């Protein structure tokens, strides 16, 4: 067997050296390959391996790749990002509306929005709770948060900026459950993870809520539960806030200089979806919803590796989804320095290896889905795009606009 490859084209034949040379000349005359070129002799096994290698698809979900505040004009200054800028410039781009990570993931895995995006019943299983016959109700996330006053606003901080141990979560939820046991026994907090608490509703009308990621570092007064049952849930929001403020644990945290766990954010309610669908065979990432969705649809899941080269050693026929959310927390809390440093790390450990893999034809397709406060953009890059010299490399600031 002989194989001639140029760009995205292959020429396969079988025969003698002379027949290979004649086939190559014919392909050159027809414009299939560029001259000078030589045939490469391969075995059947080589050919099979090469065809699989070239079929690998990789999809990166990258929230906050672009800095959300356009007024900070110097945010990209002196950032050396040749690989990232090369990928963004060579790829075809499609623009879309603003979507949070949770909404994007649910939609990608075929999950329709209910009253809320049904994050709670999906992450429940990943956090170790099997939904049994008795609790097929409406599940709601009730996550511990820290509220603080800044410039006459009550701002919310999530568990990315404070630490809460399993023992602390157990102590706080026990105190809350003891309080509600008589007045409202349906409100029972389940701390399956220190930073992720749950409630199962049977009779109380559920609220309409905002995703926790929509509220981080924002004033909460305009983002409280809404809809027909908003009065009930705003009352619960205030009541739990007062109860948590009185807890001895918070006095200890205050004395130690740790942020108080002084409120709960209700969000992500719904019933368990009937079905899940996905083209991905492998999901990589530390985001709990991505992990839970992979679990629910039967795809493999792995923690996010330190660098992209790890993916090169996986099955070449896989379709991979990688959730790169290093930048989201930094952007949400306006940490410009931390965001820039994280972007430098992504360039070194992810974008440089991926740029090389695409250029060498080791990836059939690389897609970057960038989620941002000004809108979302999809950049699709194929191996052949690297030869499109007319697509000149532009700085990241151009792609961010």
Predicted regions and their residues:
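Extended, Lys/Arg-enriched charged tracts that mediate electrostatic binding to polyanionic substrates
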Residues: 163-191, 247-258, 262-263
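A short, charged, amphipathic alpha-helix used as a generic interaction element across diverse proteins
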Residues: 15-39
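Well-ordered, non-membrane alpha-helical segments in soluble/globular domains
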Residues: 77-80, 166-176, 236, 240-243, ...
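Loop-centered beta-sheet repeat module
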Residues: 204-275
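Soluble secreted/lumenal catalytic domains
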Residues: 43, 132-133, 169-172, 179, ...
């Amino acid at each position: 067997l002989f194989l001639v490859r140029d760009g995205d084209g292959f020429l396969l034949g079988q025969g003698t050296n002379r027949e290979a040379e004649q086939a190559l000349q014919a392909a050159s005359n027809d414009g299939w390959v560029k001259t000078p070129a030589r045939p490469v002799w391969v075995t059947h096994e080589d050919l099979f391996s090469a065809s699989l290698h070239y079929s690998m698809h990789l999809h990166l979900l990258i929230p906050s790749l672009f800095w959300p505040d356009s007024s900070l004009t110097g945010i990209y200054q002196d950032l050396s990002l040749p690989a990232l800028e090369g990928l963004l410039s060579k790829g075809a781009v499609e623009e879309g509306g603003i979507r949070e990570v949770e909404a994007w993931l649910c939609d990608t895995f075929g999950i329709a929005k209910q009253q809320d995006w049904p994050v709670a019943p999906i992450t429940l299983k990943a956090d170790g709770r099997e939904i049994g016959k008795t609790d097929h109700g409406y599940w709601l996330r009730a996550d511990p948060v820290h509220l603080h006053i800044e410039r006459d606003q009550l701002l919310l901080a999530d568990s990315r900026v404070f630490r809460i141990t399993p023992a602390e979560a157990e102590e706080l939820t026990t105190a809350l459950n003891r309080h509600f046991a008589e007045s409202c026994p349906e409100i029972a907090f389940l701390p399956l993870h220190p930073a992720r608490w749950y409630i199962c509703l049977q009779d109380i009308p559920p609220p309409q809520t905002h995703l926790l990621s929509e509220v981080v570092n924002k004033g909460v007064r305009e983002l409280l539960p809404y809809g027909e049952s908003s009065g009930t849930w705003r009352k619960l929001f205030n009541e739990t806030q007062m109860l948590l403020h009185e807890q001895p644990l918070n006095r200890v945290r205050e004395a130690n200089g740790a942020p108080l766990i002084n409120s709960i954010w209700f969000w992500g309610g719904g019933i368990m979806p009937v079905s899940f669908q996905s083209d991905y065979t492998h999901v990589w990432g530390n985001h709990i919803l991505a992990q839970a969705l992979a679990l629910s649809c039967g795809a493999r899941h792995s923690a996010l590796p330190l660098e992209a080269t790890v993916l090169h050693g996986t099955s070449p026929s896989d379709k991979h989804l990688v959730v790169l959310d290093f930048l989201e927390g930094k952007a949400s809390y306006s940490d410009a320095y931390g965001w820039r440093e994280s972007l430098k790390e992504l360039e070194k450990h992810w974008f440089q290896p991926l740029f090389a893999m695409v250029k060498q034809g080791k990836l059939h397709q690389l897609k970057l889905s960038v989620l941002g406060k000004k809108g979302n953009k999809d950049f699709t890059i194929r191996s052949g795009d690297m030869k499109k010299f007319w697509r000149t490399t532009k700085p990241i600031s151009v792609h961010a606009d």
